Amino acid sequence: MALGNGYYCAVVCVVLACASVVLCAPAQLCAGAADDDPRAARFCQALNTFLELYAEAAGEQVPEYQALVRDYPQLLDTGMKRQDVVHSFLRFGRRR
């Protein structure tokens, strides 16, 4: 019976995790504040779109982000200084 309680606890944890993701969705920052100015409305729409995409990427639900993390793990390693020559040329320019 203890094994059944473990499964019950796991199911409850998964349901709570899914509910917290749904409830923590980013709020619309300027939903009705920019109705008079069309430029402000476009800016607010772009800002809200960016925040939604950022929230998805932060949750690692975007396939492109997962592919980048999988294919280029050295980009995530910030503990070491980069040693490749191309990086120094891009940073300082190539002397002739």
Curated annotation (Swiss-Prot):
Keyword DNA-binding assigned: no
One biological process term in Gene Ontology: neuropeptide signaling pathway
One GO cellular component term: extracellular region
Compartment list: Secreted
Keyword terms: Amidation, Cleavage on pair of basic residues, Neuropeptide, Pyrrolidone carboxylic acid, Secreted, Signal
Domain of life: Eukaryota
Keyword Transcription: no
Tissue: Expressed in corpora cardiaca (CC), corpora allata (CA), antennal lobe (AL) and gnathal ganglion (GNG) (at protein level). In its non-pyroglutamate form, expression in GNG detected in all animals, in AL, CC and in CA in most animals (at protein level). In its pyroglutamate form, expression in CC, CA and GNG detected in all animals, in AL in some animals (at protein level).
Annotated signal sequence range: 1-24
Positions of post-translational Phenylalanine amide modification: F92
Physiological role: Myoinhibiting neuropeptide.
Protein name, entry field: Myosuppressin
Organism of provenance: Agrotis ipsilon
Phylogenetic lineage: Eukaryota, Metazoa, Ecdysozoa, Arthropoda, Hexapoda
